Curated annotation (Swiss-Prot):
The keyword GTP-binding does not apply. CDD domains: DHQase_II. Pathway: Metabolic intermediate biosynthesis; chorismate biosynthesis; chorismate from D-erythrose 4-phosphate and phosphoenolpyruvate: step 3/7. PANTHER family: CATABOLIC 3-DEHYDROQUINASE. GO terms for molecular function: 3-dehydroquinate dehydratase activity. Gene3D superfamilies: Dehydroquinase, class II (3.40.50.9100). Keywords: Amino-acid biosynthesis, Aromatic amino acid biosynthesis, Lyase. Homododecamer. It comes from Roseiflexus sp. (strain RS-1). This is 3-dehydroquinate dehydratase. Substrate binds at N73, H79, D86, L100, S101, R110. The active site is at Y22 (proton acceptor), H99 (proton donor). The gene is aroQ.
Length: 144
């Protein structure tokens, strides 16, 4: 089983950027927790973080065709990343959109996701554990 984890712009700054909003856990810590759980389940986890939409699209085009699941936190690309949305739409794997904060309790511009219409589901506001919940769902979905 192959799971892709995609982290969009500014997520490399987790732990330093607005910890009152995003928490104090770093991206490396999130990826380590996901990798530990995936390995225990016999799954392969491939991760990427980029501040550039094109790099995320290149990753999806290279790795997404045979992926069994995709976890994506598009960051600000959530609201305007149409090329990223189109790259996700090409793939057959279930997609879980994750947001650390509850975007619906924040500024109005954050309430719209161009990714949501192509995602299987969305988890928002549960902090870094939202990634783990997404992974658990994907692992269970493939066992069903």
């Amino acid at each position: 089983m192959k799971i892709l984890v995609i982290h969009g712009p500014n997520l490399n700054m987790l732990g330093r950027r607005e910890p009152e909003v995003y928490g104090s856990v770093t991206l490396d810590e999130i990826d380590a927790a996901l990798r530990e759980r995936a390995t225990a389940a016999g799954a392969t986890l491939l991760t990427i973080q980029s501040n550039h939409e094109g790099a995320l699209i290149d990753f999806l085009q290279a790795e997404g065709w045979d992926a069994d699941g995709i976890i994506i936190n598009p960051g600000a690309l959530t609201h305007y990343g149409l090329a990223l949305r189109d790259a996700l739409a090409m793939l057959k794997a279930p997609i879980i959109e994750v947001h650390l904060s509850n975007v619906y309790r924040r500024e109005p511009f954050r309430h719209t996701s161009v990714v949501a219409p192509v995602a299987t589901g969305q988890i928002a506001g549960l902090g870094w554990r939202g990634y783990l919940l997404a992974l658990e769902w994907l692992l269970e979905e493939k066992r069903a």
